[in-house]
Amino acid sequence: MIGDLLTGTLAEEIAATSIRVFVPTTPATAVAARAARLLGLERLALAEGFTALAGAQRDWATDVFTLLQRGLLGVAVTPVQLDAAGRTNLSGIGPPGRPKVALIGPRGLPDNNDTPSPLWYLVAQHSPRTLVGRVDMVCGAAPSGAGLRTLLSPAGCFDLLEGRWHARWLAPGGRALIAEAPAFPIEVAEGTPERAATSPAALEALAAVDPEGTRLAEFGEG
């Protein structure tokens, strides 16, 4: 299942960092963060809204910005649009001021998109509607390269390096999906590996924290 592949990969990615706080934004990203604890990042605190922080906490308004600038706060987002330069859109589809569809707004993306802290973009479809040449509205500016920026999609895992997307690995059928979004170019080097499933350890962690499989609904599965 693509949901397990991407959620499990995100869990592995989070567990491999030294972040102290993770901000989940969807059910799948919350499951991934809990699984990351079982994969080795036991003391990871989860920020789950304005009134909930799982883990030891201090009531100090500037802490979030300190963590961001020190590379210690991880975020995974599901943008409405993500473009070839890494700009993100959560506000609307169509011309600024007269969008065809108005959405929830940028929330913390203006602060998160270009910091030393890691940021993952998790999209359920590798679609030309989501992955575009330039976003309709910039909610998060193009990253400068200060921190890890990774896209996880049904086509595979892709890193933003020096303003260009590069394939780390491809999911089965990934090349065809990349070709269907030509405005969002991805460099696929010769010998790029294919990955059809996440690790057994990640699958076990997902099952432990999400036995009902709620993560899969985000990907139209389950």
Task: Name each model-derived stretch.
Residues 53-185, 189-204:
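Conserved phosphate- and dinucleotide-binding cores of soluble alpha/beta proteins
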Residues 1-61:
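N-terminal active-site beta-alpha-beta segment that forms phosphate/nucleotide-binding
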